[in-house]
Amino acid sequence: MELIDFVDLTLKERLIALNWRNSDEIKKWMYLQNAISTKTHLDFIDELQFSKERQYLLVKKENNYVGVVYLTGIDFDKNQYYFGLYYNPFDKMKGVGRLLQEACIKYAFNLLGLNKLKLAVFASNLRAINLYKRFNFIKTSEKIVNRKKVDCLELQR
């Protein structure tokens, strides 16, 4: 499995990630549920090279692009970050959620040396919540985003 930093992506790869993100199947689970323009997406990626608090990675397995994992709010002082993921909605590979989650956890804990992983997930996204529970995430709180209930979960190293 290969993790490719968004700042190192080719234009074609950047557009693949945008196409996934703008698909109805993916954007319905995002806080910002509107379609993102190509210019906005490319500008966002250009700004990532200057950020120490966030990192986006395209995940490739056996020459197939399978998804994106991202870390935001990276705090090396507190040894924690928030993470998210989305998969290629046009190629429904079996077990892709597990694969992306494992990749993100290993990357953050083993390579970045962080100790705590946090995430927020819409409470109606039961498939994702069940996946997180299988990885021993613990619900720590709830909040409302876009008038929808969101569960906040954590995983300690």
Regions found by a protein language model. Give the residues of each.
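Conserved acetyl-CoA-binding loop of GNAT-fold acetyltransferases
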Residues: 133-142
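Acetyl-CoA-dependent GNAT
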Residues: 34-90
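Conserved beta-strand-loop-alpha-helix junction that forms the acyl-donor binding cleft
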Residues: 88, 118-129, 145-150
